[in-house]
Amino acid sequence: MPSYSTYLGTFSVFALAALGESQSSWTLGQGIEVNWQSSSQQLSIVQANKTLLDTVPGQNFLSASAGKDHWVGANGNFNYTDVDRNRCQSQNVTRITHSSREDSINGEDVSIQGYLQNCGDQSIGYTMSFWVPKALPDRVAFDVNVEPGHKRNALMNKLYLTFGSHVSEDFYGLGAQASFASMKNQIIPIFSREQGVGRGDQPITALEDSQSWEEDTAFSEFDFTNPDAVTVRYDALTVGGHVMQADNMLNSITMLTDFVGKMPTLPEWVDNGAILGIQGGQEKVERIVKEGLKQDCPVAAVWLQDWSGTHSQEAPYGNMQISRLWWNWESDSKLYPTWTEFVQDLREEYGVTTLAYINPFVANVSSKTDGYRRNLFLEATKGGYMVQNSTTNGTAIISSGKGIQAGILDLTNQKTRTWFADVLRKQVWNTNISGVMWDFGEYTPITPDTKLANISSDAYFYHNQYPRDWAIFQRSVAKEMPLFEEMVTFHRSASLGSNRHLNLFWVGDQTTVWGINDGIKSAVTIMGQMGISGYAQSHSDLGGYTTAFHPPTVANSSGAIGRSAEILGRWGELAAVSSAVFRSHEGNVPEVNAQFYTNSSTYSYYAYNARMFKSLGPYRRQILNNESKTRGWPLLRMPVLYHPDDSKARQISYQSFYLGADLYVAPVLDPQTTKLNVYLPGTDRNRTYTHVWSGQTYHAGQTVRVDAPHGKPAVFVVNHAHSPELSVFLDFVRKENGTVIRV
């Protein structure tokens, strides 16, 4: 069985040392040693003859450079070009000693000192320290400190650390990565942004025989393109990390979450059925809830993102209008004239709870035609509660399309937090809602003229920290509320440690198509990678959110690519067998999308999927209570977590996954598909997979072809598992096996 180690931090290159050979090994405690081989110029950390980390012989393990990268974009969309100046070309090690350290298990660390050389025309001092922390004695902690240098026009501002790899090693995690399973041969930036490689970042890496993460939140970049090495760039001169070893990948996730935290438990009411995403006001919401109950759809809640009102925004082409929200965080008097009473009536009359929507923006509602009670934008402007711009000497305006003037809350400002906490208490939580989608978090501007009230570093460095501060802030307010224990608080942007402050991650915003990079397939890949990154409880917008547009044609004057009833139904199947909650979304252009309530057939399909989700409730709950809560293990598990020795399993991203340990799932993620080829992972041929719909049992290590008509995603019971919790789902299978769903 392979071992699983963990490396933490942001690192780079190695070179020649000037250290004598009188000593080559220094103890850290717990049987762990730091070894330095002068002849090969290699540093390694070893425990019980197993290497936790090593560097590349004859190469720098640390480097630094000057140069300000070129960033373009704003409003959640960022791209960058590396600018390196005077990157240090060589390195020496001049001294390795034990030093006293209070937080070390044995009261000391191993300190490595030396110089980075040929940094332009200067040499730069550095120190790297390793120790076993008292609080977490199952790992090695480290920190790196690099001096800036003495050339004012060439001060170092980023560091690089390089450690050894091998050609067959694979890398997983690193947050919301949408397009591939292993990160090998990729360059992954860690920066919170809207979409693309690196989106929804969470700087954590799980490797085939190692795992790593950083403690800090500056921009970093993981370069896995070298077959024999991994280089991590970090945009600061100090960084800390951990190196760990576990006996399997699931246990490495436990060790990771022992440090970053585990997600709080989801309330049990989410197991009871669907969370209906609806827009349109009280009458429409109540009508759809009633229809759902008639359709035998288990309805747990409604999610009403338009509770604060909507306005229209021009689409890229044609005459189509996109529905946008008013970010003023008070109930809209036109759509929800009796909001407080309506929320309570849904709870009392139908047993349906209500979820709302909030983001860290406040918009100017002066042009809101149906009126408002407070203009939070004007209040925040007067109080100085938003992120500022020193060039305009005013609020840093966030643009999210035409017709929206908004600012982003400055969470470094205590006055902002006090003011907005009062808004949340009086205008959001006061209505006995049971949860909120806490959107965005990735929009903090990074330009040099961005001003924050109380932060010593610049906005660029703070950008990745904002999602965590947003999660900490909202949970601190929610904890004061009477219904806190039943609340669902879900986010889609995060940074290291955010997971302990939210009980659900949402992998939005997918396009309403079948694609790999940003369609339904990407939802599976992101949930898998986020699970490895410490986010055990996740879900996607059922049906997707973003409408894609093409240039208009005679047949399609708007250019909008509407959501089909087929993808809506298949996405519902995916949600039922993959996710911690079952929540739908109308999308940003509802009128071009098939909705679950469009007609009797779409509602029937949706209700069926909701019943399937509910039938899995007891099985999911025992996973969440016994494994996610205590060990940090994800609900949805990439096959590599159980089969790192299976080369095919290591490359599976969206095609299939485990739901807990006892169910293996292959969802239908392509149109007009009613049969699936499914690879059943594992090298142990005694391992079995029983197809729940046909009863056919197969052995591991082969590809099988199974029927997958609408309503019947390929689900297999692993090794004839049985339990009272699983039997509820199998009862559903027996009851519904003859059901025919037509689209």
Report each predicted region and the residues it spans.
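C-terminal beta-strand-rich structural cap/linker in extracellular carbohydrate-active enzymes
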Residues: 701-743
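Beta-strand-rich N-terminal accessory domains
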Residues: 21-73
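A low-complexity, Ser/Thr/Gly/Pro-enriched, surface-exposed linker/loop concept
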Residues: 54-116
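Compositionally biased, intrinsically disordered low-complexity segments
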Residues: 14-20, 96-99, 743
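Catalytic-domain carbohydrate-binding cleft regions of carbohydrate-active enzymes
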Residues: 28, 34, 96-712
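Prokaryotic Sec-type signal peptides and long signal-anchor helices
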Residues: 15-18, 167, 184, 346, ...
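A detector of low-complexity, intrinsically disordered, Ser/Thr/Gly/Pro/Ala-rich segments
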Residues: 4, 8, 49, 79, ...
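Fungal secretory targeting signals
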Residues: 1-22
